[in-house]
């Protein structure tokens, strides 16, 4: 199943970094999933720039703290 959405990651100054995500997660874990989990594809973008990408293997590691936070949220939700 594909899921798409937006996560607002607090910056600390009362503002948020907007992280758009696209995630493909299955009902069962897979050898191709992140940490052998259910997510097989995941893209995170901030202002149109890819800040994380996993497509059955890590392509772009988290580029900043907002990407790391969004990744943790999505891992909890879908993996």
Locate the predicted segments by residue:
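Mixed-charge, Lys/Arg-enriched low-complexity segments
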Residues: 46-79
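Generic low-complexity segments that are intrinsically disordered, proline-rich and/or Lys/Arg-biased
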Residues: 11, 30, 62-63
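Negatively charged, low-complexity tracts enriched in Asp/Glu with abundant Ser/Thr
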Residues: 1-27
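A short, structured beta-strand/loop element
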Residues: 20-56
């Amino acid at each position: 199943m594909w899921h798409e959405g937006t996560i607002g990651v607090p910056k600390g100054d009362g503002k948020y970094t907007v992280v758009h995500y696209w995630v493909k997660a299955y009902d069962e874990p897979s050898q191709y999933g992140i940490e052998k989990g259910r997510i097989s594809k995941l893209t995170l973008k901030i202002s149109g720039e890819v800040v994380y990408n996993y497509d059955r293997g890590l392509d772009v590691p988290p580029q900043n703290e907002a990407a790391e936070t969004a990744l943790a949220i999505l891992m909890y939700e879908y993996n």
